[in-house]
UniProtKB/Swiss-Prot annotation:
It comes from Rickettsia bellii (strain RML369-C). The keyword Nucleotide-binding applies. PANTHER family: SUCCINATE--COA LIGASE [ADP_GDP-FORMING] SUBUNIT ALPHA, MITOCHONDRIAL, SUCCINYL-COA LIGASE SUBUNIT ALPHA. Belongs to the succinate/malate CoA ligase alpha subunit family. Pathway: Carbohydrate metabolism; tricarboxylic acid cycle; succinate from succinyl-CoA (ligase route): step 1/1. It catalyses: succinate + ATP + CoA = succinyl-CoA + ADP + phosphate; GTP + succinate + CoA = succinyl-CoA + GDP + phosphate. This is Succinate--CoA ligase [ADP-forming] subunit alpha. CoA binds at T17, G18, S19, Q20, K43, I96, T97, E98. Pfam families: CoA_binding (PF02629), Ligase_CoA (PF00549). Succinyl-CoA synthetase functions in the citric acid cycle (TCA), coupling the hydrolysis of succinyl-CoA to the synthesis of either ATP or GTP and thus represents the only step of substrate-level phosphorylation in the TCA. The alpha subunit of the enzyme binds the substrates coenzyme A and phosphate, while succinate binding and nucleotide specificity is provided by the beta subunit. NCBIfam families: PRK05678.1, sucCoAalpha.
Length: 291
């Protein structure tokens, strides 16, 4: 069953004819994703990668029946692209763009309330259900269909968890990169809730990092959830000094909050198995499942 996307998901690309949109759409098509068109204002009526181009998301949705969109649009214009997709009623919107102004994302968060749209990202690698649907920039070949749900704030650490769970023979049900910005569309709790309710997902890997309280909120949710599944977590930034931003805009220990130790403590108290090395994620999960 997986979560959010599958082989029936119809995907359009906003920023379709740009270099990033072109490259990653080619990769998605080669993977088997059901790409049905793209949006580039002013180029409607033409074709690109043998798919139709539309001027607006409304038009693309009406003509193709798309229920998902991936956004490869520069930071100054990305929020408007998300808002257009929300307005068109696209169900899954994946925004890859890094560097969207925080106030722009606050506007987007407000527009999401009461809408039918779920936003993944921004500043994320995207979402993939192996062998079915790849939306984003992750390397498809490292994924294998399996039973581990992966949710992560970090792109490259997601790939590390994927490669390791593939190597030990577990595979993945769905992998979601929620992004490293302070304001995003989908959080750990949203994804863990879906994974807990998904029959195909037998266990969960959660990769967090310093900054914010998303991991603490997830720990609280896990602790009080009636459904229980094995969960392994790694938190990046254990050695990070307070006040220093570590890569992502949201990865900063500020006001004495958001340290790795706080997060690890909260997760451990919720019954989550912790690994302190990213190299041990797959092995830790395999050992946990083999009991």
């Amino acid at each position: 069953m997986a979560i959010l996307v599958n082989k029936k998901t119809k995907v359009i690309c906003q920023g379709f004819t740009g270099s990033q949109g072109t490259f990653h759409s080619e990769q998605a098509i080669a993977y088997g994703t059901k790409m049905v068109g793209g949006v580039t204002p002013g180029k409607g009526g033409k074709t690109h990668l043998d798919l139709p181009i539309y001027n607006t998301v409304h038009e693309a949705k009406a003509k193709t029946g798309a229920n998902a969109s991936v956004i490869y649009v520069p930071p100054p214009f990305a929020a408007d692209s998300i808002l257009e997709a929300i307005d068109a009623g696209i169900e899954i919107v994946v925004c890859i763009t890094e560097g969207i102004p925080v106030l722009d994302m606050v506007r987007v968060k407000r527009a999401l309330v009461g809408s039918r749209t779920r936003l993944i990202g921004p500043n994320c690698p995207g979402i993939i259900t192996p062998d079915e649907c790849k939306i984003g920039i992750m390397p498809g070949h490292i994924h294998r269909k399996g039973s581990i749900g992966i949710v992560s704030r970090s792109g490259t650490l997601t790939y590390e968890a994927v490669a390791q769970t593939t190597a030990v023979g577990l595979g993945q049900s769905t992998c979601v990169g929620i992004g490293g910005d302070p304001v995003n569309g989908t959080n750990f709790v949203d994804c863990i809730d879906m994974f807990l309710q998904d029959d195909e997902t037998k266990a969960i890997i959660m990769i967090g990092e310093i900054g914010g309280d998303a991991e603490e909120n997830a720990a609280d949710f896990i602790k009080h959830s009636k459904i229980k599944k094995p969960i392994v977590s790694f938190i990046a930034g254990i050695t990070a000094p307070p006040g220093k931003r570590m890569g992502h805009a949201g990865a900063i220990i500020a006001g004495g909050k958001g340290s790795a130790e706080d997060k690890l403590e909260a997760l451990q108290s919720a019954g989550v198995t912790i690994t302190r090395s990213p190299a041990d994620i797959g092995k830790t999960m395999l050992d946990l499942l083999n009991g």
